Amino acid sequence: MLMSLTLSLQAEDGRARAATLHTAHGDVPTPTFMPVGTAATVKAMMMDSVRATGAGIVLGNTYHLMLRPGADRVAALGGLHRFMDWPGPILTDSGGFQVMSLSSLRKLDKDGVTFQSHIDGSRHRLTPESSIGIQHKLDATITMAFDECTKFPATHEEAASSMELSMRWAARCRDAFVPRDGYGLFGIVQGSVYNDLRTQSVTALGDDFHGYAVGGLAVGEGQEAMFATLDHTLPLLPRGKPRYLMGVGTPDDILGAVMRGVDMFDCVMPTRAGRTARAYTSQGVMNMRNARYADDGRPIDPACDCPACTRHSRAYLHHLFRAGEMLGPMLLTWHNLNYYQSLMRGLRSAIMEGRLEQHAVTLRAAWAAGDREKQDG
């Protein structure tokens, strides 16, 4: 069995879990949301600001970092933590999802993938071994196995072939991974929306990865199918290992997944929305470009303690986006990340206190009601 990175379960409420992930770069309370720092930066945020939201772990991307600035350069400069000024844990995506999405620019074979850079057209190759090697050079706290993200929709035969390839690659990743105290390697469960393939994938991975991701979801299958796949897959995974749902998602997606037993999440949604004037709030989603906010002196979310909400009005954010000022995306990105972290803290507290079902009802009712005062007024 591989050594080190561990999860301490503290409470369970139904299938939901509150735990602490222990790593070489610090402890992370779960459930946790990981802001996405694809190119060694969380877009529109200083890393001190990311820390101020309550984030305990961030995500980097192997594909983007290997192309620019390069893994060797990052390693020579002290590793990704020093390079991007983030002392806490970093999880790196293996690069598989990005490479597979290149379609016409890549060629897949049983040993790996040859692809052209989207930046300059240069040719590169990723294999399970080279992906692990790059992630080691980056000094990732959590390394992800290199896999093929199954397309959606896929026939059962296509999904089976893709899953089997990913399982062979996972075994090679496990062999290539160099264990260190407080570092870990996560396997990725594949199989699309087919329960029998998900079962086969879990069996093939075995129980000696440090954690397990559920991949191949949030790719167009819809929430009902995603939750059904989680309902089948999560109980098959080792109880004492962290469970990571990749690329998810909306607050309601996260709530439903936490209630099913997921511990870790990442998604570009809060940062991307922040750059396009969409605010996630305790009252649902607001578009700050909407004319209804032009004279609205209230904070975006009265329950939020971020700078956008404690220092500025909805009218000011509306003005910034209408004027094309860069401060608008900066403030709203901070707000969205702050809201996501607040959501995770609330879910953790509810699990610890055995009131998650009640908390979920309250959250969903508030999201559905929206900004009632303005609507009624």
Swiss-Prot record:
GO terms for biological process: queuosine biosynthetic process; tRNA wobble guanine modification; tRNA-guanine transglycosylation. Pfam families: TGT. It catalyses: 7-aminomethyl-7-carbaguanine + guanosine(34) in tRNA = 7-aminomethyl-7-carbaguanosine(34) in tRNA + guanine. Binds 1 zinc ion per subunit. The active site is at D93 (proton acceptor), D266 (nucleophile). Pathway: tRNA modification; tRNA-queuosine biosynthesis. Residues 247-253, 271-275 are annotated as: RNA binding. The keyword Phosphoprotein does not apply. Its cofactor is Zn(2+). Its EC number is 2.4.2.29. SUPFAM superfamilies: tRNA-guanine transglycosylase. Zn(2+) binds at C304, C306, C309, H335. This is Queuine tRNA-ribosyltransferase. Keywords: Glycosyltransferase, Metal-binding, Queuosine biosynthesis, Transferase, tRNA processing, Zinc. It comes from the Bacteria. The keyword Metal-binding applies. Catalyzes the base-exchange of a guanine (G) residue with the queuine precursor 7-aminomethyl-7-deazaguanine (PreQ1) at position 34 (anticodon wobble position) in tRNAs with GU(N) anticodons (tRNA-Asp, -Asn, -His and -Tyr). Catalysis occurs through a double-displacement mechanism. The nucleophile active site attacks the C1' of nucleotide 34 to detach the guanine base from the RNA, forming a covalent enzyme-RNA intermediate. The proton acceptor active site deprotonates the incoming PreQ1, allowing a nucleophilic attack on the C1' of the ribose to form the product. Belongs to the queuine tRNA-ribosyltransferase family. Homodimer. Within each dimer, one monomer is responsible for RNA recognition and catalysis, while the other monomer binds to the replacement base PreQ1. GO terms for molecular function: metal ion binding; tRNA-guanosine(34) queuine transglycosylase activity. The lineage of its organism: Bacteria, Pseudomonadati, Pseudomonadota, Alphaproteobacteria, Acetobacterales. Substrate binds at D93, S94, G95, G96, F97, D147, Q190, G216. One of its GO terms (cellular component) is cytosol.
